[in-house]
Curated annotation (Swiss-Prot):
Tissue spec. comment: Plasma.
Pfam families for the chain: Cystatin
Compartment(s) of residence: Secreted, Extracellular space
Additional notes on this entry: Rats express four types of kininogens: the classical HMW and LMW kininogens produced by alternative splicing of the same gene, and two additional LMW-like kininogens: T-I and T-II.
This protein's name: T-kininogen 2
PROSITE patterns the record matches: CYSTATIN (PS00287), CYSTATIN_KININOGEN (PS51647)
Post-translational modification: As T-kinin is preceded by a Met instead of an Arg or Lys, it is not released from its precursor by either tissue or plasma kallikrein.
Keywords for the protein's UniProt record, in alphabetical order: Acute phase, Disulfide bond, Glycoprotein, Protease inhibitor, Pyrrolidone carboxylic acid, Repeat, Secreted, Signal, Thiol protease inhibitor, Vasoactive, Vasodilator
Source species: Rattus norvegicus
Length: 430
């Protein structure tokens, strides 16, 4: 049986989405409704790894908003069909599965339209499983890809590697963070194959200021978005030995509203000579001298970079160079202004995090340092401290939101590791 537009049985128009300024309700007899929902449903079926395709049952809500790009929003209901996702058929060529055994669902989607072509911007489908017969061991395909929980601990190192690979191999100015795991499958081979689909979002951490993703990097709600499909092979030594992925990245300048000029709650660069840093630096050097077992005190020689972030208080992140002084801990109870740095003393490159809540008199400093061995062989008269430059960032940049569209193709299950690309080996540590 071929499903045609008669399936577009509208139970109600859009009372909620129509409240959006400029949004117009759509009539169920509008052919555009079918074309848009057909695009969205085909995309959803194309992303399924196993099982049967879903068929359109009813469109329940629909609006459009005109602009530089016309935006369409729909809610529609779907039911499981009798055609597998590998059949090569479209959903219109399938029949509904028996009602009692069929899974059902409801999808919410937003699409854009340019040059008479629809593209899915966002889509969320909630599926209710049917009451089909339970699978036995004989029904399971040994050696085939099987779905696994998307919050499985086995996926943590795989996802971490995937996001790091994306950040290290793209020319984007900012780091991206994981937002959602959309699909996860594993296959037992001589080791383990993983297939994952996940979404990413731009954070406020630029690659210029942050060499790697940190916990305080904040996802930007109006930043660039992307969706990735990855294949990972973990060998019998629990090492990621094979990895490939493809990502579709979409700029945040096509849909929805402007990003505020100021990102409240995001880390901001502050001048290295700012008086605001005085107290935080004092706590940092005190913590360094308290935890360092060197016979002499250290003092801060150069502040290289500093940021502050408003949280429940203020968090300072400071990079500085500390140098050994002539004040020994045996004869001095604390570091004083009279302590001078030794010309050939030891130097440390330090990173400090200082969390301050003044109204509670609470200060929590953490400092990590590494010796600057390069200082031993510096030429006479040369001081790397004089070469430190303050980097300024431009404010006022605005970005627009555009949710991602995934255009990936199904991958065939294989018995070995994904052959596309070999990533650098990295040990899997949950």
């Amino acid at each position: 049986m071929k499903l045609i537009t008669i399936l577009l049985l509208c139970s109600r128009l859009l009372p909620s989405l129509a409240q959006e300024e400029g949004a117009q309700e759509m009539d169920c007899n509008d052919e555009t409704v079918f074309q848009a929902v057909d695009t969205a449903l085909k995309k959803y079926n194309a992303e399924l790894e196993s099982g049967n395709q879903f068929l359109l049952y009813r469109v329940t809500e629909g609006t459009k908003k005109d602009g530089a790009e016309t935006l369409y929003s729909f809610k529609y209901q779907i039911k499981e069909g009798n055609c597998s996702v590998q059949s090569g058929l479209t959903w219109q060529d399938c029949d509904f599965k028996d009602a009692e055994e069929a899974a059902t669902g409801e999808c919410t989607t937003t699409l854009g339209k340019k040059e008479n072509k629809f593209s899915v911007a966002t889509q969320i489908c909630n599926i209710t499983p049917g009451k089909g017969p339970k699978k036995t061991e004989e029904d399971l395909c040994v050696g085939c890809f099987q779905p696994i929980p998307m919050d499985s601990s086995d996926l943590k190192p795989v996802l971490k590697h995937a996001v790091e690979h994306f950040n290290n191999n793209t020319k984007h100015t900012h780091l991206f963070a994981l937002t959602e795991v959309k699909s996860a499958h594993s296959q037992v081979v001589a080791g383990m194959n993983y297939k994952i689909i996940y979404s990413i979002v731009q954070t406020n951490c630029s690659k210029e200021d942050f060499p790697f993703l940190r916990e305080d990097c904040v996802p930007l709600p109006y930043g660039d978005h992307g969706e990735c499909r990855g294949h990972t092979y973990v060998d019998i030594h629990n090492t990621i030995a094979g990895f490939s992925q493809s990502c579709d990245l979409y700029p945040g300048d096509d849909l929805f509203s402007l990003l505020p000029k100021k990102c409240f709650g995001c880390p901001k660069n502050i001048p290295v000579d700012s008086p605001e840093l005085k107290e935080a630096l004092g706590h940092s050097i005190a913590q360094l001298n308290a935890q360092h077992n060197h016979l002499f005190y250290f003092k801060i020689d150069t502040v290289k970079k500093a940021t502050s972030q408003v949280v429940a208080g203020t968090k300072y992140v400071i990079e500085f160079i500390a140098r050994e002084t002539n004040c020994s801990k045996q004869t001095n109870t604390e570091l004083t202004a009279d302590c001078e740095t030794k010309h050939l003393g030891q130097s440390l490159n330090c990173n400090a995090n200082v969390y301050m809540r003044p109204w509670e008199n609470k200060v929590v400093p953490t400092v990590r340092c590494q010796a600057l061995d390069m200082m031993i062989s510096r030429p006479p008269g040369f001081s790397p401290f004089r070469l430190v430059q303050v980097q300024e960032t431009k404010e006022g940049t605005t970005r627009l939101l555009n949710s991602c569209e995934y255009k990936g193709r199904l991958s065939k299950a294989g018995a070995g590791p994904a052959p596309d690309h070999q990533a650098e080996a990295s040990t899997v540590t949950p």
